[in-house]
């Protein structure tokens, strides 16, 4: 009886780990194809900027509170 339970637990662990591995590979492929990952947003020249503390960086350099 105990042996059957051990075998059942081992098989369930194997199935769950295989399922998780498949999903992690699929998620990585989706992430590589995602336009959100490939596209970097930045502020164009002339837009106001505040240095390193701003959420969206300048495409160039922040100089005198303007992107250049």
UniProtKB/Swiss-Prot annotation:
Record remark on domains: The presence of a 'disulfide through disulfide knot' structurally defines this protein as a knottin.
Signal sequence residues: 1-20
UniProt keyword annotation of Secreted present: yes
Compartments (UniProt record): Secreted
Tissue specificity comment: Expressed by the venom gland.
UniProt-listed SUPFAM superfamilies: omega toxin-like
Example of a GO cellular component annotation carried by this entry: extracellular region
Protein name according to UniProt: Omega-theraphotoxin-Hs1a
Annotated keywords: Calcium channel impairing toxin, Disulfide bond, Ion channel impairing toxin, Knottin, Neurotoxin, Secreted, Signal, Toxin, Voltage-gated calcium channel impairing toxin
Prosegment residue ranges: 21-40
Function: Reversibly blocks N-type calcium channels (Cav2.2/CACNA1B) in rat dorsal root ganglion cells (IC(50)=40 nM). Elicits no toxic symptoms in either vertebrates or invertebrates during a period of 48 hours post-injection, when it was assayed in vivo by direct injection into mice and cockroaches.
Family label: Belongs to the neurotoxin 36 family. 02 subfamily.
Bridged cysteine pairs (disulfide): 42-59, 49-62, 58-67
GO molecular function term, any single one: calcium channel regulator activity
């Amino acid at each position: 009886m105990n042996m059957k339970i051990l075998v059942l637990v081992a098989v369930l662990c194997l199935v769950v780990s295989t399922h998780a591995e498949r999903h992690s590979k699929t998620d990585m492929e989706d992430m590589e194809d995602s336009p959100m990952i490939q596209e970097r947003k930045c502020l164009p020249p002339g837009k106001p900027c505040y240095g390193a503390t701003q959420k969206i960086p300048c495409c160039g350099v922040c100089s005198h509170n303007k992107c250049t």
